[in-house]
Amino acid sequence: MGKIIGIDLGTTFSAIAELDDLGNPEVLSDPENNNRITRSAVYIGRDKAIVGDKALDAAVTNRKNTILEVKSQMENDVVWSTKEGKWIDKEGKKDIKGYVPSQISSIILSKLKDYSSGVKKAVVTVPAMFAQAARDATMDAAKLAKLDVELINEPTAAVLHYANLPGSSINGRVLIFDLGGGTFDITIAAVNGKKVDVITSVGDKNLGGRRFDEEIINIIDKKYKKAKGKGLENPLEDESLFVIAERIKKILSNKDKVSEIIEGPKGPHKIDVSRTEFENSIDTYVEKIKMLLEQALEESKCKPSNISQTLLVGGSTRMPIVTEIIKKIMKKAPVKGVNVDEAVACGAAIYAGLQNKEGLNSAQKKAISKVELNDVCNFYMGTLIYAVDQERNQGGMINDIVIPRNTKLPCSITKDYRVM
């Protein structure tokens, strides 16, 4: 049948994993630089496309040919114009030259696929809150990369990895807190050994590390303007500032303050950014995270005391404020010790094994023999109908829900409608 791999197709970083000969998920490194995670940046050159850190480097000098965060555009009907260096809405426009999101995403998938050999199938992860249009575009990207693909939600993949760790103590109802570079998901699941039953998922498809970087850039811009009398030029379009902001954010996870020399229109200037300043700047996002935590608990009919463990996923969970939020609401610290950048890819590899049992050796089959996953529908699914209010003798179009959110999958629900 051929090998099946697991791919975490992230907003800012991506990763690929496969089962080793003993059935344990193994993250594959980029053969060019040995990196276990690959930056989801694409540079469109005259002769070929470049993916990864080299593409990000190119963004500093050639932004128009460098595409970042393509994942955030997957559900949109847009084209990246290398002439204008931005996404352009296709609606009402003809003959726009450029690249649609699925084409750019396929370049990343092709790069990752080459880390292994003989790969024709893959399990690709998507945010739990990804719209159907975005899921369809991801499938299109896989086809362009010559991959037969099945999708799995990112937090669901992550809990599979946690539950299948050697000697895992993960059990009972758990909360998966997945804060990455561009999206945020919370999933509550029941874990019994290697059996995972998803209960509910909530999230925000536009909340993640890139938004935090923007706030750091705003801090830098204000301080530069105060010191020099003139602000930076289009700071949120300057990729070199995002590189600096990302570095500041990472350092502030371990230190209270960091200094950087910022080049601007009035010359260089040393700027200090404190952890307190940074955390205050993202207060709106912090409140949204708290709200979604409360929503997940309410939807699952759980109190914090009913949750045995909170599991971290995604690079942005390294920020100290994340631990503070979880401690305050969940009344206990989150579980640490797993590589939060790789957990989703590893879970995808485990799920890939479930989809390819015929292609596994005896040790691999034994390793995943007790793995079981039961997921839910993350969205209300229905159809647009014309309904009549008999009391008011009025009619109108409404969205009639056929499958409620959090319905266990697979499911089959039948409703009868009359055609007018």
Which residues does each PLM region occupy?
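Oxyanion-binding/catalytic loops of NTP- or PPi-dependent enzymes
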Residues: 1-73, 82, 93-94, 98, ...
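Globin-like tetrapyrrole-binding proteins
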Residues: 108
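Structured alpha-helical segments in the cores of large, soluble enzyme domains
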Residues: 112-113
